[in-house]
Each structure stands twice: as structure tokens, then as C-alpha cells.
Amino acid sequence: KYWDVMNEPEFKMFFKGSKEDFIEIFNFSSKVIKEKQPDAVIVMAGAAGMFPENKKYWKSVLPKIKDHFDIANIHHISGPDGQCDGELWVDEFAALLKSVNVDKPIWVTEAMTCGPPVKAWVKAFVNGAELIIDVGVNAPGPKMSKKGRKQLNEFINEYDGFTSIKSISKKQVEFTYKDGSKKILEF
């Protein structure tokens, strides 16, 4: 049911074509998938972060593909130098989507943190992420500490399944669930 069409096309190591080639392939693929599977959910090709060159690429491409996907997709992988963004790029990605009139759910389908993982995930959710997929322990690059991994697993076990999240202070968020119950997290 879920189709992730292509991967990080702004990186030549994944896609050798031009922007126009990507747009044509993406839109055609999405159209064929929807024709063959009407209930399919198309996930946008993952944007490889929000570095200036990535933003420039997606600012020109998004208006031409926005009618051909259901879920916007951002990746956050730490570079070899360990550089990362505190909200897993979700704040900047949400602003970019808004700037080109794209109003779609945001998924982070490759999440690697380099700081406290729970704090990064909470900030990403507060900034609009609907779903975050951890790249796991076998991903290349810097590894999450055992303590961070334990904290992230505990966070997921305790707070998964929420329907909304809001900041109630600089270090507190409130999760709301389908049954109306609420949980507060201090981080």
C-alpha cells in the first residue's frame, strides 16, 4: 500500500538524471501506481536533509510533483563529521513545504541523531513530523550511544500511538491519545 518512489534524487550517487528527469519519472511512476492500486499511498522521494543545495533542489522540484504524492519525506543522516540538526530537519522542511504551498503529512523515513535522541524526536514531532523511522544500529556513520538507544526505546514504548503533541513549556510536551488521555514528558 505504501510506495516510496525513489531516494534522495538530489544526490548524484542515487540518481544520475536532471531535475526534469526526476520530475518525469516520479510523476509517471506515481500515476501508474495509483492506476494499478487506487488506495496506494505515495511517499515522496526522501529529501537528503535541508542543506542549502538540497533546499534549492526541492524548492524547484516540489511545485511540479506536489500533486503526485501523499506524504512528504525528509531524511536526517549525520555526516562523517557528526553534523546534525536538532529537529531532524523537520522545522526547515515544513517551512519549505509551506513556501511552495504543499500541505502534506511529514515523515522522517531515515532518522539518525547525533545528540540526545528523545529530544530530537520530540522536537521533530512538535515541528510537524507524523512518523519517524530510526535507521537502526546497522546504519553507516556515527552510532547512537547505548544510553541514547535505551532512552529512545523507552520513549517509544511509553509514548507511541499519540494523536497530537504540543509544547507546554521549553522542556515539556503534552501527548494526546485517541481516548482523550494525555501524557506529559519532561526532557
Predicted regions and their residues:
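Active-site cleft segment of glycoside hydrolase catalytic domains centered on the general acid/base Glu
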Residues: 1-69, 75-95, 99, 115-122
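Aromatic- and carboxylate-lined catalytic core of secreted/periplasmic carbohydrate-active enzymes
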Residues: 113-187
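Short, structured coil segments at secondary-structure junctions
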Residues: 68, 102, 127-128
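Secondary-structure transition/hinge residues
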Residues: 37, 101, 157-160
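Generic beta-sheet signal
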Residues: 45, 109, 134-135
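Active-site neighborhood of phospho(di)ester-bond hydrolases with catalytic His/Asp-centered motifs
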Residues: 73, 107-110
